[in-house]
C-alpha cells in the first residue's frame, strides 16, 4: 500500500468517526430536556469541545 492509499484510508476512517459524532450530537441536543442526563452531557461536552478545538485549528492551518 502506498502512502496515498494509506492516508486515504486514514481520512476515510476519520470521516466515519466525525459522521458518527454528528449523529451523537444530534441525539444529545434532542435529549437535553432530561435533567438526569445533564451531568453526563456536561462531561461529554467538555471532552468533545477539546476535540472540536483541535479540528478547528487543523482546518485553519490547512486552508
Regions found by a protein language model. Name each.
Residues 1-63:
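Non-heme di-metal
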